[in-house]
Curated annotation (Swiss-Prot):
This is Phosphoribosylformylglycinamidine cyclo-ligase. It is found in: Cytoplasm. Keywords: ATP-binding, Cytoplasm, Ligase, Nucleotide-binding, Purine biosynthesis. Pfam families: AIRS (PF00586), AIRS_C (PF02769). Belongs to the AIR synthase family. HAMAP family: AIRS. It catalyses: 2-formamido-N(1)-(5-O-phospho-beta-D-ribosyl)acetamidine + ATP = 5-amino-1-(5-phospho-beta-D-ribosyl)imidazole + ADP + phosphate + H(+).
Length: 344
């Protein structure tokens, strides 16, 4: 039995600090608000109506993290954009099915809450929500003494979107003869970071070393691109058959996820140049071409399949939206024993 009266704070959990964080982030949460959201922060659950423009609304959900990119961000003390990465990983998975993101929730866990760090992370989450037009409606911030090393934290995100039932994009419309359009990435996005950290280790490179005039750290911590508004415009004005989000598994595993069993994607490797950071990784890590395309996006964030007649319009729309877009390949019939992705 303790001779002194114990409190939760004595055990390492400071409720006052948590309340201070809530006050700090209220403004960031408010700027993401959508008209469908009811109430504010502090409720047991977040309430959101379905947008009235949908006749047969289908909800689409997704959850994700940022992998070990978070380790790099913590080590380099750059916390302001990792939240955008978190949102991007979730909303980009929704938009490929044609879904407009509605609301987002985050999970932030740490051993001892640092209000400044947490507020910076959540501001980044709000930035990402603003970019994708979805509301940050709540989340969980938990202080768990003994569970994390000092200064460490973990992040997860959850998003819900909506799509008209008749407009779901699921790849079933993909046909032989379709053209493939690529959307450029902002860097490695949030995949392959365990290998990136290994390359940094074995090469002895310093994150402050320059590549094309920028520190390696800037290349590696460039926030994941959010494609929501560009793709929403595209699918409103053109016929889109499928969209693949190039995340873990790269080209080899993500493109087949949206292809009918009798088709293959033929990628023209000469249609683009890898951004310098991917060439650096391949050289310093002695990584095979196959492994590069399995682990990294190599400069391609999305691959879109659409009819050839839509290509000119699609490229113009994407350019207007500020995207780097180009024809990267085509859909062909899959022969016996062939792989569903060929990179030539």
């Amino acid at each position: 039995m303790s001779n002194t009266q114990l409190s939760y704070k004595d055990a390492g959990v400071d409720i006052h600090t948590g309340n201070e964080l809530v006050e700090r982030i209220k403004g960031d949460v408010k700027r993401t608000r959508r008209s469908e959201v009811m109430g504010g922060l502090g409720g047991f659950g977040a309430l959101c109506a379905l947008p009235t423009k949908y006749k047969e609304p289908i909800l689409v959900s997704g959850t994700d993290g940022v992998g070990t990119k978070l380790r790099l961000a913590i080590d380099l003390k750059k916390h302001d954009t990792i939240g955008q990465d978190l949102v991007a990983m979730c909303v980009n998975d929704l938009i490929v099915q044609g879904a407009e993101p509605l609301f987002f929730l985050d999970y932030y866990a740490t051993g001892k809450l640092d209000v400044d760090v947490a507020a910076s992370v959540i501001k980044g989450i709000a930035d990402g929500c603003e970019m994708s037009g979805c509301a940050l409606v709540g989340g969980e911030t938990t202080e768990m003494p003994g569970m994390y090393h000092e200064g460490d934290y973990d992040l997860a995100g959850f998003c819900v979107g909506v799509v008209e039932k008749s407009e779901i994009i699921d790849g079933t419309a993909v046909k032989t003869g379709d053209t493939l359009i690529a959307l450029g990435s902002s860097g490695a996005h949030s995949n392959g970071y365990s290998l990136i950290r290994k390359v940094l280790e074995v090469s002895g490179a310093n994150p402050a070393d320059l590549l094309e005039g920028k520190p390696l750290s800037e290349h590696f911590l460039a926030p994941t691109k959010i494609y929501v508004k560009s793709i929403l415009q595209l699918i409103k004005q053109t016929e889109v058959h499928a969209i693949a989000h190039l995340t873990g598994g790269g080209f080899w595993e993500n493109i087949p996820r949206v292809l009918p069993a009798n088709t293959k994607a033929v990628i023209d490797e000469s249609s683009w140049q890898w951004p310098a950071i991917f060439n650096w990784l391949q050289e310093k890590g002695n990584i095979s071409r196959y492994e590069m395309y399995r682990t990294f996006n190599c400069g391609v964030g999305m691959v879109i399949s659409l009819p050839e007649k839509e290509v000119e319009t699609a490229l113009a729309l994407l350019e207007q939206a500020g995207e780097k877009a180009w024809v990267i390949g085509k859909i062909e019939h899959l022969g016996e024993g062939e792989a569903q992705v060929e990179i030539q």
